[in-house]
Amino acid sequence: SSLRVRPGQAAVFLYQNKGTYDVITGPYDDVVRTENMPVLASIIGTAYKGGTPFPAEVYFINLSKGMELPFVIPFFRVIPSEPEYKAYDIEVAIKGAMTFEIPTRQEYLKYFLEAWGSSDTSMADFESKVKTLLTQEVKRVVSNAPKDTGIFIMHFNALIGELGRYICSRIQDPIAHRFGVFASGINIEDIRYDEESEGYQRLKRLTEDQTHLYNLENEKTALLGYEIQRQTMRT
């Protein structure tokens, strides 16, 4: 069979046992031959001058590295980590986008094909399914950030870049294991507090004269420490 794979695409050949596959990365415009596919060749050999017939499911995957999935998370509850302020929980809303890509490494393709292999998948299909998990994970990470890192809840906007990187490092595994995609970044566009709430008003009054007690550099280090640890583990 002839095969045309455009630049920025990959064709994944999934064989009958569903556990092995070959990947042809574009640009490619030629006849598919057994001899050009190492996994297939190891299964059935290279008989007939590389023209051995073989059954396989073929999936075309977008390899773009800058795909974005926007999200808007309505107000949800976040509790300060400081014991004296735990009574003053605050409602927080977040708007941003997840940047992602679809790697062709085996560990990602396994999850990707399990999640999406039963049918053609459009960007709309992807968004509708991933957004639910993405929202859950972002809420979980942000809700626990004060307790897990020591960041002061009123400093979220001052540390918006570091918070985005921290969120990304914490959601990468759940997103990959469920959908087979790599979350390469979380860009937070806006973080809003429910400034009309009693908890926000009281906490603001109690802490507005205590900003000297908090060190933003230490909080940045705490947020980025998890990301640095994960990068070290990958190398």
PLM features: what roles do these ranges have?
Residues S64-T235:
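Elongated, amphipathic alpha-helices that form coiled-coils and helical stalk/scaffold elements used
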Residues S1-Y111, W116-D120:
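Hydrophobic membrane-anchoring helix/hairpin
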